[in-house]
């Protein structure tokens, strides 16, 4: 259910999910992710995402975020659109404000809650933004449009 990804959750809600190894998941329309949308050629499509919560030692709340989508970016060589598949799995550790660098296990990304709350859609949007190539371009020059082909010849 995508509505679950657009709702705010308190730390107490998240801890309850972690205690029973609960999950939040669904599809989010790319058009409803404004920071991501500004980087895309087109906002058509959606991202499939799930968050699996659990409690780790010493009562630490963790989650695994899995997401898959294909976004349409603008190639910086030929200025034409191309499809960029994105698939990511991120291990998250929820920390108190200011603890992001302290004692975070190497395999986990520390997440500070906004005023003790989490908006999953925002977290998913953050991970998608990080997954987009710094300089989006077709994998091969041969796949580029006429502008790049004219520059090469």
Functional labels for PLM-detected ranges:
Residues 1-153:
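Acidic and generally charged, gly/proline-rich low-complexity regions
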């Amino acid at each position: 259910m995508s509505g679950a990804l657009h709702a705010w959750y308190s730390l107490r809600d998240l801890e309850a999910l972690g205690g029973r190894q609960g999950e939040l998941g669904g599809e989010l329309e790319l058009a409803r992710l404004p920071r991501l949308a500004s980087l895309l050629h087109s906002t058509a499509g959606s991202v499939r995402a799930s968050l699996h919560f659990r409690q780790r030692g010493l009562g630490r709340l963790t989650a695994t975020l899995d997401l898959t989508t294909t976004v349409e970016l603008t190639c910086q060589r030929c200025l034409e659109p191309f499809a960029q598949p994105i698939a990511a799995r991120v291990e998250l550790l929820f920390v108190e404000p200011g603890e992001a660098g302290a004692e975070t296990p190497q395999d986990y990304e520390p997440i500070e809650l906004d005023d003790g709350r989490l908006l999953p859609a925002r977290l998913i949007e953050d991970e998608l933004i990080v997954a987009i190539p710094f300089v989006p371009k077709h994998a091969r020059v041969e796949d580029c449009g006429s502008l790049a082909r004219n520059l090469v010849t």
